[in-house]
């Protein structure tokens, strides 16, 4: 009895160890350090100095690696799916024996008595299925991201991560994508709807996640018995 209990406990531990977390949706670094500035040119006595040049009418827009901007996440998703299936199958078989037949290992009287015998069989199968699925999701938040690369056409590759911990629950938001500098407002803000190749991920770790998600043992039974 003790050996069976030990085997059961070891099997449970092995199954728990087999639980693999899904890879993160946002790949790559979520921040970038600004590139080092070139060594300043020595003063040559002129009024204009190339090392300290700053355009007077240049907008303070994120155009270099290491610059930051704010992404306003406004994602609304709504899907509806309906499916109905009806299958019907009917089969039939009919045969007649009009004369006596000769069957080995049967008495002649029984074989001759089969004359005039008819065989009839029929079968039918019906299958009807119907399913409806509706999903509505709303995700509203904001995150400040860093420019990690500047493409040849001037578009900005951005990525960022924000983590907020309240008591024992930790919420993390990760975002990556490509932003057109023309879509950035004067206050360095852009909507997530204008981010190309957007990868937005939100995860919560803590007691809330433990209560909302089924345990690993329940997942095993649900995969084996989905009904």
From Swiss-Prot:
It is found in: Cell outer membrane; Bacterial flagellum basal body. A lipid is attached at residue 18 (S-diacylglycerol cysteine). Keywords: Bacterial flagellum, Cell outer membrane, Lipoprotein, Membrane, Palmitate, Signal. Transmembrane segments: none annotated. Coiled coil: none annotated. It is a lipid-anchor. One of its GO terms (cellular component) is cell outer membrane. The keyword DNA repair does not apply. One of its GO terms (molecular function) is cytoskeletal motor activity. Its main location: membrane. Pfam families: FlgH (PF02107). The keyword Protein transport does not apply. It comes from the Bacteria. A lipid is attached at residue 18 (N-palmitoyl cysteine). GO terms for biological process: bacterial-type flagellum-dependent cell motility. Residues 1-17 form the signal peptide. Assembles around the rod to form the L-ring and probably protects the motor/basal body from shearing forces during rotation. The basal body constitutes a major portion of the flagellar organelle and consists of four rings (L,P,S, and M) mounted on a central rod. Belongs to the FlgH family. This is Flagellar L-ring protein 2. It comes from Chromobacterium violaceum (strain ATCC 12472 / DSM 30191 / JCM 1249 / CCUG 213 / NBRC 12614 / NCIMB 9131 / NCTC 9757 / MK).
